[in-house]
């Protein structure tokens, strides 16, 4: 390649905004996990920590703001307010920082200190709510603040159709492209439900035989048993069925115990070199359960790994002697 062509190729890789770095995250085969558990399947992790603010939620943060700007609901002076357990807030904080908007995050006090500090590092204001009230308490506080602050806007990840839509437009097509259509099962945790809904919807549109499996905490089995409860798998298990979850998309729900999610997350770090979060551990544990079923022998399972484990070093998942 000539120097001129090299310069041209290099210029084409320079992005103008952090938001342009979102998406096109890699798939990696969890070969050691497969080997260590004697699994005759291919388990692929979609590693969302490669998004610029470190999680799958960067996708919806950008999408919700972009749609609100198009609709005239957000301008340069708009105060953004969002109830979040963490990752959506971090993604929004990065987008708001780049745009210059003020951002107020309401979140349960039970979320990790890393999540709080990350949002503050991006310049967001964090308002903590009663942990016993879960996400419902954070949502109520966000609505209260929106009523008090003029020119404010709540992206509302739990009700905003841009949430599942961006996964149908990006996450699903990326998986289909990178597997060359060779995907049999999708495994995704349910927080807002946007990932499993949008991604699952796209994959099923390409092949109706693709099985979609939703993952929730065993401590709060809202989808599988109809009741909420306390759990430690941050990012999934909001305690209610969100508007952004289409329950007709998934074929099965697997409930995962806190310790199983912790243990699998630790295993991914120690054996695969993948430092991912608690909900990633839950998704891979569920994938492992599916892999043990005789009918799934030889199949390809894609598990969404939503974020990085660096957000949870202070939690029970990484308590070292």
What label would you give each PLM region?
Residues 2-321:
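PLP-dependent amino-acid enzyme catalytic core
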């Amino acid at each position: 390649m000539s120097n001129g062509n090299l310069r041209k190729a290099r210029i084409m890789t320079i992005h103008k905004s952090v938001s342009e770095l979102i998406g096109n995250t890699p798939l990696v085969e969890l070969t050691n996990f497969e080997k260590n558990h004697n699994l005759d399947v291919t388990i692929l992790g979609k590693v969302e920590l490669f998004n610029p603010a470190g999680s799958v939620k960067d996708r919806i943060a950008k999408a919700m703001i972009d749609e609100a700007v198009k609709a005239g609901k957000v301008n340069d002076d708009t105060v953004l307010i969002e109830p979040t357990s963490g990752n959506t807030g971090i993604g929004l904080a990065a987008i708001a920082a780049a745009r210059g908007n003020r951002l107020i995050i309401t979140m349960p006090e039970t979320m990790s200190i890393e999540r709080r500090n990350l949002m503050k590092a991006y310049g967001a204001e964090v308002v903590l709510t009663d942990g016993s009230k879960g996400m419902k308490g954070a949502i109520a506080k966000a609505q209260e603040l929106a009523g008090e602050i003029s020119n404010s806007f709540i992206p509302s990840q739990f009700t905003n159709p841009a949430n599942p839509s961006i996964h149908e437009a990006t996450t699903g097509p990326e998986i289909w492209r990178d597997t060359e259509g060779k995907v049999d099962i999708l495994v995704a945790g349910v927080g807002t439900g946007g990932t499993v809904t949008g991604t699952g919807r796209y994959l099923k549109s390409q092949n109706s035989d693709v099985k979609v499996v939703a993952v929730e905490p065993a401590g709060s089995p809202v989808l599988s048993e109809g009741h909420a409860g306390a759990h430690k798998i941050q990012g999934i298990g909001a305690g209610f069925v969100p508007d952004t979850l289409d329950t007709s998309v998934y074929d099965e729900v697997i409930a995962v115990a806190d310790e199983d999610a912790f243990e699998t997350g630790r295993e991914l770090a120690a054996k695969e070199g993948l430092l991912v979060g608690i909900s990633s551990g839950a998704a891979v544990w569920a994938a492992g359960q599916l892999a043990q079923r005789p009918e799934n022998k030889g199949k390809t399972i894609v598990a969404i790994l939503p974020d990085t484990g660096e957000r949870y070093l202070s939690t029970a998942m990484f308590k070292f002697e």
